[in-house]
């Protein structure tokens, strides 16, 4: 998804706490959805639960209507990388279900994603999920004042490729604040020491998307759903994180 513009907006401590509140809501709703994922459940059921949580918490869905996207959730299963539509397809034992979700609360956005195993999954699928999660942690750890954007990128890439998997290059992380997508872009591949220098007050959504096979993706006829071109599994984790003088502050972690 395109960025709002090329301006880097540094956030005050008060603004970061407002972003924290929005991201806590995202994290709590994702936890609720994770708890109900099991064989036989559908993406549309998750969407209905999500709609109820949004109404109860008096927040706005960040994705629904954004550049025409028709749902509150992105639900991507197995070979789907990102932006999958919630559907009537039932989840089966061994599936990987990635949920990407965001809200708008008091003028600030929250955004996070998680990949959830359905029942017992294969050892290869489990290793993909674990590696993707670990790559996110590595990227977050690089979010320190004075480092550069591609220090984050390189940390993610080295974790992923060291495990024999591929980082998706067609989609990137991004700044977040009063807009869902702000500058800078944060690729999941790059060279240490390159890119914009990280400053206190930057808030970034770091989101490795990792394929078991090659890095290439294609878009389905719905115009949104991205899938691996080779049909292999994909996993996706995301946190919104603030750069502070004390290190990274993960806003979407509870």
Language-model features and meaning:
Residues 1-254:
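Active-site neighborhoods and metal-handling regions in enzymes and metal-associated proteins
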